[in-house]
C-alpha cells in the first residue's frame, strides 16, 4: 500500500455552492486526511493524503465535477 499526498485546484462555480463540504465528505468516505479551502481567486484548493488508490478515486470524483 503506497501512501501519497497530492494537491489540486478546482476552478469554476465552486464557492458558495457547498463544494467544499461535498469534497470533505468524499475524502472522509475514502479515509483521507488533508484540507479543502477557498482561494482569493475564486478557486478551491484540495490537499488529500492517504492510500494512492483512494486519493486517485477522489481526484476522479473532482475531474467529474464533484
Swiss-Prot record:
Keywords: Hydrolase. Pfam families: Acylphosphatase (PF00708). Its EC number is 3.6.1.7. GO terms for molecular function: acylphosphatase activity. The active site is at residues 20, 38. The keyword Hydrolase applies. Residues 5-66 form the Acylphosphatase-like domain. It catalyses: an acyl phosphate + H2O = a carboxylate + phosphate + H(+). InterPro entries: Acylphosphatase (IPR020456), Acylphosphatase-like_dom (IPR001792), Acylphosphatase-like_dom_sf (IPR036046), Acylphosphatase_CS (IPR017968). NCBIfam families: PRK14426.1. Belongs to the acylphosphatase family. This is Acylphosphatase. The gene is acyP.
